[in-house]
From Swiss-Prot:
Notes on the domains: Possesses an unusual extended V-shaped dimeric structure with each monomer consisting of three distinct domains arranged along a curved 'spinal' alpha-helix. The N-terminal catalytic domain specifically recognizes the glutamate moiety of the substrate. The second domain is the NADPH-binding domain, and the third C-terminal domain is responsible for dimerization.
Organism: Methanothrix thermoacetophila (strain DSM 6194 / JCM 14653 / NBRC 101360 / PT)
The UniProt record lists the keyword Nucleotide-binding: no
EC number: 1.2.1.70
Gene: hemA
Annotated catalysed reactions: (S)-4-amino-5-oxopentanoate + tRNA(Glu) + NADP(+) = L-glutamyl-tRNA(Glu) + NADPH + H(+)
Name of this chain's protein: Glutamyl-tRNA reductase
Database matches in CDD domains: NAD_bind_Glutamyl_tRNA_reduct
Active-site residue numbers: C49
InterPro entries linked: 4pyrrol_synth_GluRdtase, 4pyrrol_synth_GluRdtase_dimer, 4pyrrol_synth_GluRdtase_N, GluRdtase_CS, GluRdtase_dimer_dom_sf, GluRdtase_N_sf, NAD(P)-bd_dom_sf, Shikm_DH/Glu-tRNA_Rdtase
Protein role: Catalyzes the NADPH-dependent reduction of glutamyl-tRNA(Glu) to glutamate 1-semialdehyde (GSA).
Residues where NADP(+) binds: G180, A181, G182, E183, T184, G185
């Protein structure tokens, strides 16, 4: 059984700009590129604002991933390469929210489901990755049901609202413009409404989407072409679009600040970023991006240490079950190869016996069936105890016994041929 190898570029080692630059195309293009490598049997990609993670099932997984990093010009300084067991642990921790910038956030679980569904629907995953991702998603759900890991502001969107509240000393009566009405924009808008703000404005490229979200929350939808004018009236702008380029330049914000006395807070949580960094130079404007949210992450970490211990206990329990499943599969594949070889020998010897008997008299159907049944029974009985022993060895993690079995039946020679 080929195993999982993964390459991670995340907020732990990389800045937001380095994560942005790790891969410029969409997920489908990245999947196609990764799968084009000869030895890649399965692959999946997780790409969010805080991470680009590539999972491959390949006998040469590490080599393939280093080649991909080299071609994409990703510095080895910001890369983590995980082997099979490390990848399984990481996936379970990721789905549980322990690897997120905001510990325990719910958004990552939805993103994992969606990105896994994309890879599976396009035919890039098989049993090995399906098993890992299904278990990770199941564990993510269990953790949120049995612990309080996600009971505070845990999504990036919620953290952006908390940051705004912290900077301004409260959001009561404030006018807030949310740019982007997708999943993150919706999370932001809902979090804002709970803060008793004065006015909520929502804008989106597709006006109908903005209209629907604003109407559901008692806010006002703003046509996208009027967005820059509406900034003049806002105390806070939170941007979370999926645009591949800046949507707000320095000139745009300078015009919005003309004749304005009160300050403007802009929080850009998009990846790639929505707001030009040069906006920081404008007097009266305070710009924050995802990097600023690390403050919120640190605070949540302190408050959730007790829950993290409970989550890790669940992960440890589920990881053992997952590892056992892979070990059983490994033993089953080995046994299938042994039985396949035995079947070939059985058929050869039965044919030889039939040919010898046919020299003396014509064999009837019943006689042929008796010979076939007998040979089948002999094979099964000979391998009954070795089968149990190999399955037991696999579940105990006794890889040496599996290796000896491969050598004994000369199966390792087939792999090297």
């Amino acid at each position: 059984m080929s195993r999982i190898t993964s390459m991670l570029v995340t907020h732990k080692k990389a800045s937001i700009s380095e994560i942005e630059n790790a891969w410029h195309g969409d997920v489908e293009a990245l999947l196609k590129w990764v799968s084009s490598h000869d030895t890649v049997e399965e692959c999946a990609v997780l790409k969010t604002c805080n991470r680009v993670e590539i999972y491959v099932v390949s006998p040469r997984g590490e080599k393939v991933l280093f080649e991909i990093a080299k071609k994409a010009r990703v510095s080895s300084r910001i890369i983590d390469i995980h082997d099979h067991d490390e990848s399984l642990l990481h996936l379970l921790r990721l789905a549980s929210g322990l690897e997120s910038m905001i510990i325990g956030e719910d958004q990552i679980l939805g993103q994992m489901k969606e990105l896994y569904r994309t890879a599976k629907s396009l035919g890039y995953t098989g049993w090995v990755l399906d098993t890992a991702f299904k278990k990770a998603i199941q564990v993510g759900k269990r953790v949120r049901k049995e612990t309080a890991i996600n009971e505070r502001s845990v999504s990036v969107g919620s953290a952006a609202v908390d940051l705004a509240e912290q900077i301004l000393g409260g959001l009561e009566g404030k006018s807030v413009l949310v740019i982007g009405a997708g999943e993150t924009g919706e999370l932001i808008s809902k979090a804002l409404v709970s803060k008793n703000i004065g006015s909520l404005y929502v804008t989106n490229r597709t006006f109908g989407t903005a209209l629907s979200l604003a109407a559901s929350l008692g806010g006002t939808a703003v046509p996208y072409e009027e967005m820059k004018r509406k900034i003049r009236e806002a105390d806070v702008v939170i941007s979370a679009t999926s645009a591949p380029h800046y949507i707000l330049l320095k000139d745009d914000i300078e015009r919005a600040m003309e004749g304005r006395k009160n300050k403007l807070l802009i929080i850009d949580i998009a990846n790639p970023r929505d707001v030009d960094e040069a906006v920081r130079e404008i007097e009266g404007v305070e710009l924050h991006n995802i990097d600023s949210l690390k403050q919120i992450s640190d605070e949540n970490m302190r408050l959730r240490m007790r829950e993290i211990e409970r989550v890790e206990a669940i992960i440890e329990e589920e990881l053992e079950l997952l590892r056992a499943k892979y070990k059983r599969r490994e033993a089953e594949e080995l046994l299938a190869r042994i039985y396949s070889e035995a079947e070939k020998i059985k058929e050869q010897e039965v044919r030889r016996a039939m040919n010898k008997l046919s020299a003396y008299h014509t064999l009837g159907e019943i006689e042929q069936k008796v010979l076939m049944d007998m040979s089948h029974s002999i094979v099964n009985k000979i391998f009954a105890e070795p089968t149990k022993a190999l399955k037991s060895a696999a579940e105990r993690g006794n890889t040496e016994m599996l290796r000896y079995a491969m050598e004994l039946f000369r199966l390792n020679q087939e792999e090297s041929d």
